[in-house]
């Protein structure tokens, strides 16, 4: 199934039913009085997180959704039926944004979470509501109010604890295949990974974490080059980022420059994401001698001013991967426990995630704006060239041969 992580849609809540104007008419009962009932409330529109979904592709083909309107009231004080609510299923991890105000309406991060996105209209009032001691036969009713209309954007961000960063062919997908049951495509050419993939890493029974792989970044990604920039937003929910560096690239490029390029692109994309806890992992260490690996490690430390630990693995042969996953899970469990014990810390983490997501949206919107401007300029140049050709046709000389 095609992976779609963004979808703009229109939602329309149902209109409230109108109130009824009616008077009681029965044999032997004179001046029976008003008995017009109220209308029914309009249906509302909700989004509900469904753990069985993993893409927003269905919302690419249908963009408008409308809840049922309430029925009008009837005589004998009968109230109209309420309009049925419309519940739209979305994947877990979906953020909802009001496209008019650019305000984040809410996040659906757990299966079963439900979010109101369009409130149904209020029911109208029948003429029985307006009866009083001075107005025994009111001919006044109140119509139901209109339901709320909204244009919203759905943004899916995968829910993972650990996110993978690296250039194409650094071995990110191989790492996920080696530590989990996930089977992302692996090949010896760049951009094998085209969409994010998730893997559940089970260290022990009932002890696990989720790792996410996104398409590789290249130099200039923050300016729109390559595939990875639009998927970086999926890392905003990750607690730890793994920066995977190929110590022996097949194209003979410098591992030091590769590591520096990723750091630069992250800084340009989102300063807050760049401050996220990041673990540096050297991959394919089995292709070099210990002294050569040590030299690469020394150069990377100097180039990045790296003071933390550097882990050395060979994902294809599972060398060092089990120890790395054990340390990752142990650290994650400490972070999770701190947030459970300290609500203020959990709230700070939530604010940091919101800030990263906002920066990601702004950067992607800027790149889209640049792309549209460049496309329009190219189209304009093409039209100018066509006009020049037409002018040349009008100015060409015609010679008649006698």
Curated annotation (Swiss-Prot):
Residues 1-159 form the Obg domain. GTP binds at residues 166-173, 191-195, 213-216, 283-286, 314-316. It is found in: Cytoplasm. Mg(2+) binds at residues 173, 193. Residues 376-402 are annotated as: Disordered. Its main location: cytoplasm. GO terms for molecular function: GTP binding; GTPase activity; magnesium ion binding. PROSITE patterns: G_OBG, GTP1_OBG, OBG. Its cofactor is Mg(2+). Keywords: Cytoplasm, GTP-binding, Hydrolase, Magnesium, Metal-binding, Nucleotide-binding. Residues 385-395 have a biased composition (Acidic residues). InterPro entries: G_OBG, GTP-bd, GTP-bd_Obg/CgtA, GTP1-OBG_CS, GTP1_OBG_dom, GTP1_OBG_dom_sf, OBG_GTPase, P-loop_NTPase. Its EC number is 3.6.5.-. NCBIfam families: Obg_CgtA, PRK12297.1, PRK12299.1. An essential GTPase which binds GTP, GDP and possibly (p)ppGpp with moderate affinity, with high nucleotide exchange rates and a fairly low GTP hydrolysis rate. Plays a role in control of the cell cycle, stress response, ribosome biogenesis and in those bacteria that undergo differentiation, in morphogenesis control. Belongs to the TRAFAC class OBG-HflX-like GTPase superfamily. OBG GTPase family. PANTHER family: DEVELOPMENTALLY REGULATED GTP-BINDING PROTEIN-RELATED, MITOCHONDRIAL RIBOSOME-ASSOCIATED GTPASE 2. HAMAP family: GTPase_Obg. Monomer. This is GTPase Obg. The lineage of its organism: Bacteria, Pseudomonadati, Pseudomonadota, Gammaproteobacteria, Cellvibrionales. The gene is obg.
């Amino acid at each position: 199934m095609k992976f779609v992580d963004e979808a703009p849609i229109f939602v329309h809540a149902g209109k409230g039913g109108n109130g009824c104007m009616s008077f009681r008419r029965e044999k032997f009962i004179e001046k029976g009085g008003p008995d017009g009932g109220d209308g029914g409330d309009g249906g509302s529109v909700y989004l509900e997180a469904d753990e069985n979904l993993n893409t927003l592709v269905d919302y690419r083909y249908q963009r408008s959704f409308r809840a049922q309107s309430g029925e009008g009231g009837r005589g004998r004080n009968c109230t109209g039926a309420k309009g049925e609510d419309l519940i739209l299923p979305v994947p877990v991890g979906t953020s909802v944004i009001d496209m008019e105000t650019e305000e984040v309406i809410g996040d659906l991060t757990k299966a079963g979470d439900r979010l109101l996105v369009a409130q149904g209209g209020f029911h109208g009032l029948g003429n029985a509501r307006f009866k009083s001691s001075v107005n025994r036969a009111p001919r006044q009713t109140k119509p139901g109010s209109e339901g709320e209309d909204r244009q919203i954007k759905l943004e899916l961000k995968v829910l993972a604890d650990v996110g993978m960063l690296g250039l194409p062919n650094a071995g990110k997908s191989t790492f996920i295949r080696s530590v989990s049951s996930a089977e992302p495509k692996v090949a010896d050419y760049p951009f094998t990974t085209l969409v994010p993939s998730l893997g559940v890493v089970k260290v022990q029974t009932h002890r696990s974490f989720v790792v996410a792989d996104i398409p590789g970044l290249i130099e200039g990604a923050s300016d729109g080059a390559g595939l990875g920039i639009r998927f970086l937003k999926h890392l905003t929910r990750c607690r730890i980022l793994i920066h995977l560096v190929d110590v022996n690239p097949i194209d003979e490029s410098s591992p030091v420059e590769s590591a520096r390029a990723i750091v630069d692109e992250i800084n340009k994309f989102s300063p807050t994401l760049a401050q996220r806890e990041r673990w540096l992992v050297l991959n394919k260490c089995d292709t070099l001698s210990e002294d050569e690996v040590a030299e690469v490690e020394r150069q990377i430390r100097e180039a990045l001013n790296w003071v933390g630990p550097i882990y050395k693995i060979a994902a294809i042969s599972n060398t060092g991967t089990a120890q790395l996953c054990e340390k990752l899970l142990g650290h994650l469990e400490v972070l999770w426990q701190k947030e459970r014990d300290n609500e203020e810390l959990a709230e700070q983490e939530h604010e940091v995630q919101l800030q990263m997501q906002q920066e990601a949206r702004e950067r992607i919107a800027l790149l889209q704006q640049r792309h549209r401007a460049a496309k329009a300029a190219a189209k304009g140049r093409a039209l100018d060239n066509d006009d020049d050709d037409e002018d040349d046709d009008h100015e060409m000389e015609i010679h008649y041969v006698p």
